[in-house]
């Protein structure tokens, strides 16, 4: 049964229109956030108003539990939130409460594919797990490890249902106790005691979609449970991605289907769109259309289930595993913030790169014109140096080095946002309404 606070939260979200299908995610950390003097949660608390003002609906927070690695991605004592390098449990709860007070949902970074043990067994292998509570919750032994993870297991568990994670024991998610106790832990994170609303599933390649479905259905996250499924794209002999990436996006769509499809909260990060954009903005914008005239990523097939992004803590930040061309980052945001799908803004770009105002302006255009994850897309131009698209008949956007695309802009549209290599137009009626709102707001001061 929902508590009064939870019911109030749901009502607030409905009033803010978040139930309409439009989500603006914000990744609220990077790879180095754990180093923050005074704690990352406290720093982020001071930025809540800026995040709210930008139209964000969901903030993705780092893994909250004790971890062998400082960033949180090698978790051990899952119930121990005070051992996090990002701050204390009370600081986390205060941050989530502040977000809720502004109508923003909090996404927990859920790392359950693998887990680090506290103690060695009689073989001298680290495979005795401590849950972080005085009782026996999540206190596991080697029989909770997949038997094909021979470095750690005792050979009695089930086979792994997904990809191997070599650095830590792969947990046996077919074990009933594992499923029940991890579900209970997630429900605890979602309860009033902590307050998370939704999930980001780390390394979801490590366990089957059917396993993910167990946790999603067992915890009913509010609005989304977005999976990280980062697989290699198809590359040509020139080292660039092949034009056709249908197999890559099909794997992402298949995962959504297998966790429950439309009826499920399951979603995926659109790594297909990310990979194509990385190359397209370097003078190959013809890549941004598929053979059917649609967007070439997951947003071209199932946009409601796609979370689009420019960079994250892995691809960008200090890891730089797959970075977006740094001089064209705003072209990436002009694309994802005007197109179908559920866009995610990266902390670094918003706060550290000085792009806050430009990104917020694009979000404002999106929200002012009612662009959502399922908006219609008409691609008007896809040349090497220019890409132009119309969204819902209300917004037109352009990215690329070509300056003049005026012949493609329909009559009755007004320039709403622009910067290096991008421009966005909206119908004059929307622009006038926005101006009237600003005028009336100023008059009331």
Curated annotation (Swiss-Prot):
Pfam families reported for this sequence: Alpha-amyl_C2, Alpha-amylase
Binding site for Ca(2+) 3: 149, 164-165, 168, 170
Single biological process term from Gene Ontology: sucrose catabolic process
Cofactor: binding comment: Binds 3 Ca(2+) ions per subunit.
Catalytic-site annotation from UniProt: 202 (nucleophile), 228 (proton donor)
Signal peptide per UniProt: 1-21
Matches recorded under Gene3D superfamilies: Glycosidases, Golgi alpha-mannosidase II
Binding residues for Ca(2+) 2: 130, 133, 135, 139
Keywords, sorted A to Z: Calcium, Carbohydrate metabolism, Glycosidase, Hydrolase, Metal-binding, Signal
Protein origin, superkingdom: Eukaryota
SUPFAM superfamilies: (Trans)glycosidases, Glycosyl hydrolase domain
Family statement: Belongs to the glycosyl hydrolase 13 family.
UniProt-recorded name of the protein: Alpha-amylase isozyme 2A
């Amino acid at each position: 049964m929902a508590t009064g606070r939870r019911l109030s939260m749901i009502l607030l979200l409905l009033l803010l229109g978040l139930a309409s299908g439009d989500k603006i995610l914000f990744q609220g950390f990077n790879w180095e956030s754990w180093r923050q003097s005074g704690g990352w949660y406290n720093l982020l608390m001071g930025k809540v108003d800026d995040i709210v003002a930008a139209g964000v609906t969901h903030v993705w927070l780092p893994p909250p539990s004790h971890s062998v690695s400082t960033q949180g991605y090698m978790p051990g004592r899952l119930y121990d939130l005070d051992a996090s390098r990002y701050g204390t449990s009370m600081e986390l709860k205060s941050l989530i409460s502040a977000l809720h007070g502004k109508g923003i949902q909090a996404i927990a970074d859920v790392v359950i594919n693998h887990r680090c043990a506290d103690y060695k067994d009689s073989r001298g292998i680290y495979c005795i797990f401590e849950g972080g509570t005085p009782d026996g919750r999540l206190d596991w032994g080697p029989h909770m490890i997949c038997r094909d993870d021979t470095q750690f297991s005792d050979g009695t568990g089930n086979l792994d249902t997904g990809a191997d994670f070599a650095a830590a024991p792969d947990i046996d998610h077919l074990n009933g106790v594992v499923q029940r106790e991890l579900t209970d832990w997630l429900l605890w994170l979602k309860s009033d005691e902590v307050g998370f609303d939704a999930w980001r599933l780390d390394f979801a390649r490590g366990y089957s979609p059917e396993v993910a479905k167990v946790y999603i259905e067992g915890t009913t996250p509010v609005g989304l449970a977005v999976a990280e499924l980062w697989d290699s794209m198809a590359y040509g002999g020139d080292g660039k991605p092949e034009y056709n990436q249908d197999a890559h996006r099909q794997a992402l769509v298949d995962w959504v289907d297998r966790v429950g499809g439309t009826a499920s909260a399951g979603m995926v990060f659109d790594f297909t769109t990310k990979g194509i954009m990385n190359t397209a903005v370097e003078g190959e914008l013809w890549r941004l259309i598929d053979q059917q005239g649609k967007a070439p990523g997951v947003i071209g097939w199932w946009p409601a289930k796609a979370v689009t992004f420019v960079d994250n803590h892995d691809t960008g930040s200090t890891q730089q595993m797959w970075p977006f061309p740094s001089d064209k980052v705003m072209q990436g945001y002009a694309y994802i913030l005007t197109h179908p799908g559920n866009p995610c803004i990266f902390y670094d770009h918003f706060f550290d790169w000085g792009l806050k105002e430009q990104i917020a302006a694009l979000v404002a255009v999106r929200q002012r014109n009612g662009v959502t994850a399922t908006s219609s897309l008409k691609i008007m131009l896809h040349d090497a140096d220019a890409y132009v698209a119309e969204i819902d008949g209300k917004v037109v956007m352009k990215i690329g080095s070509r300056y003049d695309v005026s012949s493609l802009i329909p009559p009755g549209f007004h320039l709403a946002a622009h910067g290096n290599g991008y421009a966005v137009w909206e119908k004059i009626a929307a622009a006038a309404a926005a101006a009237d709102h600003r005028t009336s707001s100023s008059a009331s001061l």
